[in-house]
Amino acid sequence: MEVKRFVCNMIRENTYVVSDDTRDAVIIDCGAFYDMEKAAIKQYIDDNQLVPKHLIATHGHVDHHLGDRFVFDTWGLKPEVAGGDEDLMERLPEQAKEICGEQLTADDFAPVGRYLTPADTIDFGHSRLTLIDAPGHSPGGTAFYSEADKVLFTGDTLFRGSIGRTDLEGAQAP
């Protein structure tokens, strides 16, 4: 499994492109807002001849969805989002103003493809990501785990050296 991280948008959110030896790929938490961020992700995917199969999100805060429309327009993928964050997803334009100071509309975001449950898996190429419920930062917070590669994508549930933020909409402190 190959993992490439991109630091995106005004919040400095982590976007990941994950691929395997088949060149199938998954884009996780696409926060690409600026043109240079979108160009870097597209160039990486093109240069490595990757084929994005899924756009998945660990939760429904706007900084993890600012690039969803770019992915939808470029590769036709709709975001697959943790169930429990439906209200957050419906409020993306409002979140953009509150959290990022940006005036965006619903048309600036891709339509949700489906809401995920813990029973779902994300399969691409020879790889599989399983879902782990990780509420706290948001009601539907989800981590994606590759057992074969021992890799865990936590979104904002965990930060280096600490737990994730619990002061945003929908969060619950432990």
PLM regions and their residue ranges:
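Divalent metal-coordination and catalytic microenvironments
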Residues: 18, 29, 59, 71, ...
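Short glycine-enriched loop/turn motifs at secondary-structure junctions
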Residues: 10, 22, 107-108, 159-161
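Metallo-beta-lactamase
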Residues: 32-34, 95, 121-174
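Accessory terminal helices/loops
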Residues: 1-4, 76, 166, 173-174
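Conserved beta-strand hairpin/beta-sheet module of binuclear metal-dependent hydrolase folds
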Residues: 1-48, 143-155
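Active-site HxH/HxHxD metal-binding segment of metal-dependent hydrolases
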Residues: 33-124
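Short Gly/Pro-enriched turn/cap motifs at secondary-structure boundaries
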Residues: 6-7, 111-114, 133-135
